[in-house]
């Protein structure tokens, strides 16, 4: 069982790699806890896959409650915690079985490492380690050095990026050329009740998604091409602010109808807020959004 809202490459892995190998995936709306519980009872899955903060609409499933249901069904819960990072949420402490992070993103944080991390308990460690040895999941020594260098400053960077994202999201809410803003700290967020419970430190991540008012793809491209400091890039979690167009990047493998069903519209962009002065990020967004 997997959440309907996932990173596009994760969706592709489940449907284009696992499915031909005989692993069926049932996609469920993880914003509906009863639907998740019913799906687990009906299908008795071998695993459950979800994200702490869903990409790109930043919905926040009730991880702790889903973990309890998974444990009751003796089903491993796999959580991608890349957006939230261990600074905000530690899924293993909430009952998850396996946690994955893109090392490329916040943990290394400088856009110069390609790698990932799997964190688990002793029960799953041995088979995962054997799989790693067989398939060659070994990071090179220099990449490992760069990653460890990045981890040393990770808390400082993350706190700054979270604070910046709060300011940017708040500013975007009142911009005349923005239709809707998606950010976990929004008091009107549909998952606000359990966001407070899951994010006790008051840090809500550095990702902000928003819809450009009345924009088609050409208008979105004009906005992104008008950015002077923020980099149009297919990544996130760097010290530099970056903007991505989900319809043409992270979720490009989905059909337009599939994206529409998920709520990923053609005027949606995803902003990874960096460590720059928040005023500079806001100024760049403002001039780009006002560009004809």
What are these regions (language model features)?
Residues 1-177, 182:
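Conserved PLP-enzyme active-site core in the AAT-like
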Residues 128, 219-223, 281-285:
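Hydrophobic side chains in well-ordered alpha-helices
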Residues 166-240, 254-260:
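Conserved small-domain helix->loop->beta segment predominantly found in fold-type I
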